[in-house]
């Protein structure tokens, strides 16, 4: 396991402390979330099950014997645990590098507490070095791309990739994201946009940050 993975794994272990006994919890998508799923395997008898933010996560949860629930069949979730691509000190994030941003945002919004787990490289002063994913309806791809150019970004179509919802992803490079909440709302209002990967309206409540010295820093 490389150093970055060790930091992710340490944060994932700490996140178990936030899982209520007997609960149905929300589980995210991606390499860091996978470390959390590995940790869940140790306590699977203590929880009722999980709501997954992607088909990949659902498959992984089922493989370790955790029951996966449809979000429509459960109420508010006590906690959602997921990673991020970038996070700032206000706990605003860029997410969706794995393409599951819409379902991640839905499950996060359905949860009382959002625990973000990350290695220290993900904490940044300003969001935007990581390209911002935007999920778009296929027929609106070019329209949305032109609007994103007017915002100062350089959108790139993620070719040969389709989301779990049957849509496309534009990865937007070089956006100046000084006001994440305003940028999120501006992009989400564009016709044809399902959602963008800015999580400012539904930011994290707690950041568990794996450090290179083996510790996990808690930021709230």
UniProtKB/Swiss-Prot annotation:
The active site is at 104 (proton acceptor). It is an enzyme of class 5 (isomerase). One of its GO terms (cellular component) is cytosol. SUPFAM superfamilies: D-ribose-5-phosphate isomerase (RpiA), lid domain (SSF75445), NagB/RpiA/CoA transferase-like (SSF100950). GO terms for molecular function: ribose-5-phosphate isomerase activity. It catalyses: aldehydo-D-ribose 5-phosphate = D-ribulose 5-phosphate. Its EC number is 5.3.1.6. It holds the Pfam family Rib_5-P_isom_A. Pathway: Carbohydrate degradation; pentose phosphate pathway; D-ribose 5-phosphate from D-ribulose 5-phosphate (non-oxidative stage): step 1/1. Transmembrane segments: none annotated. Homodimer. This is Ribose-5-phosphate isomerase A.
């Amino acid at each position: 396991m490389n150093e970055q993975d060790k930091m992710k794994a340490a944060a994932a272990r700490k996140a178990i402390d936030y899982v209520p006994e007997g609960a149905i919890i929300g589980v995210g998508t991606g390499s860091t979330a996978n470390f959390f799923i590995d940790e869940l395997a140790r306590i699977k008898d203590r929880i009722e099950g999980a709501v997954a933010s992607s088909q990949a996560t659902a498959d992984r949860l089922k493989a370790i014997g955790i029951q996966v629930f449809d979000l429509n069949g459960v109420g508010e979730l006590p906690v959602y645990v997921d990673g991020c691509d970038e996070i700032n000190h206000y706990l605003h994030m860029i997410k969706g590098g794995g393409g599951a941003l819409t379902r991640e945002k839905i499950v996060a919004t359905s949860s009382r507490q959002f625990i973000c787990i990350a290695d220290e490289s993900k904490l940044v002063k300003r969001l935007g070095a990581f390209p911002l994913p935007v999920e778009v309806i296929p027929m609106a791809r070019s329209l949305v791309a032109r609007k994103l150019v007017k915002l100062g970004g350089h959108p790139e179509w993620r070719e040969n990739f389709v989301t779990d919802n049957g849509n496309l992803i534009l990865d937007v490079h070089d956006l100046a994201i000084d006001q994440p909440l305003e940028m999120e709302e501006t992009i989400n209002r564009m016709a044809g946009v399902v959602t963008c990967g800015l999580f400012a309206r539904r930011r994290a409540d707690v950041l568990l940050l794996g450090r290179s010295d083996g510790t996990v820093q808690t930021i709230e």
